[in-house]
Design a protein with these regions (language model features):
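Substrate-binding pocket helix/loop in short-chain dehydrogenase/reductase
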Residues: 94-96, 103-105
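Conserved glycine-rich cofactor-binding loop
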Residues: 11-13
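Active-site helix of classical SDR
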Residues: 119, 157
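Residue(s) in the substrate-gating loop at a strand-loop-helix junction
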Residues: 141
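C-terminal helical subdomain
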Residues: 181-182, 200-246
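Active-site-adjacent segment of SDR/Rossmann-fold oxidoreductases
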Residues: 130, 146, 167-177
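The beta1-alpha1 cofactor-binding region of Rossmann-like NAD(H)/NADP(H)-dependent oxidoreductases
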Residues: 57-69, 101
Length: 249
């Protein structure tokens, strides 16, 4: 029987690559994201596996959208085995004291509240289905460990994702729900294109940074969910080998 997955932010980048890897591994995947055209494009890219993809336009900053997403998955496929909480975003790099309050709220809504709400809805399904349980994987980012300059909103939410991961792991145990976190550094996506031109470093200089093939991340997601539910990759870091992470800050 095919596993059922939800991938948020599936219209581009890491979400698209991960959704395609899951589809190619035999999953049925609900593609969640704000742009239906992008989700449809992801589904088309799956080739022969396109029938196993379901595009569900979803804004993770809107609770009603999230509730509707998981209700549709349950109504369509009857169960849920995997959620990849991937959708999110950042803010323009500005000094902490100049960050607009509204920008702070928007980043928190996308990067923390959205994954929390997705986790809530997923757990409601996973705890009551038969066979019971499932897996939730959170996209934490390298910024869950070390900040970039002028990134207080993004860095704070990614550190908070680690708390969400740990709490979900603890609270999900009794229901056979495993939760892990993948911390990604400099995968080739539209979001990291700016790194090829140079990004601000902690010492005030600007430097281009190496990136890695996003397929490495997608393959890691498939591996994390290949384990039985009595085993869990609690935390995994997948990063460009030569990126300035170790020693950053």
């Amino acid at each position: 029987m095919a596993k059922i997955a939800v991938v948020t932010g599936a219209g581009s980048g890491i979400g698209r690559a991960s959704a395609l890897a899951l589809l190619n591994s035999g999953y049925k995947v609900a593609l969640a994201g704000r742009r239906k055209d992008a989700l449809d494009e992801t589904a088309k890219m799956a080739g022969n596996n396109t029938p196993n993809a379901m595009a569900v336009p979803t804004d993770v900053t809107k609770r009603d959208d999230i509730v509707a997403l998981f209700a549709k998955v349950k109504a369509t496929w009857g169960r849920l085995d995997l959620v990849f909480n991937n959708a999110g975003g950042g803010a323009p790099p500005v000094p902490l004291e100049e960050l607009p309050y509204e920008t702070w709220l928007s980043v928190v809504a996308a990067n923390l509240t959205g994954p929390f709400l997705c986790t809530q809805e997923a757990m409601k399904i996973m705890k009551d289905q038969s066979p019971r349980g499932g897996r939730i994987i959170n996209n934490g980012s390298i910024s869950a460990h070390a900040p970039r300059p002028f990134s207080v909103a993004y860095t704070s939410t990614k550190h908070a994702i680690t708390g969400l991961t740990k709490s979900t792991s603890l609270d999900g145990r009794q229901y056979d729900i495993a939760c892990g976190q993948i911390d990604i550094g400099n995968a080739v996506t539209p979001m990291t294109e700016r790194m090829t031109k140079g990004v601000l470093q902690p010492n005030g200089t600007t430097m281009a940074e190496p990136r890695m093939d996003v397929k490495a991340v997608a393959d890691a997601i498939v591996y994390m969910d290949s384990l039985p539910l009595d085993a869990n990759v609690q935390f995994m870091t997948v990063m460009a080998t030569k990126m300035p992470f170790v020693g950053r800050g």
